[in-house]
Regions:
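Strongly charged
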Residues: 1-92
Length: 92
């Protein structure tokens, strides 16, 4: 499902026009990104938790050039769905 499809379906379900729904969806996504950039966790009851997971520095191989490269330590976004969400998906 694309963002446009999500906006269209949510607009139909709620009766809110698509432009307003698009602004709401983009606002939520932007707020989620900003919170994670500031290293804050985001918890949405009934859906799940967005957190950051730290990845340590590691050595990898560039197989096309047959050389080793260093990958710096970095954080990645991680989503953990809540129990109710997992059960609903498993039951479908």
């Amino acid at each position: 499902m694309t963002k446009n499809e999500l906006v269209r379906i949510a607009s139909q379900k709620t009766g809110i026009d698509q432009q307003t729904m698009l602004a709401a969806v983009e606002g939520i996504v932007d707020t989620l990104k900003e919170a994670l950039i500031e290293k804050e966790n985001v918890f949405i009851r009934g859906w799940g938790t967005w957190t950051l997971k730290h990845r340590a520095k590691k050595t990898a191989r560039n197989i096309s050039k047959n050389t080793t490269i260093e990958i710096a330590a970095h954080d990645i976004p991680y989503f953990k769905p809540c129990k109710e969400f997992l059960e609903a998906v498993a039951a479908s």
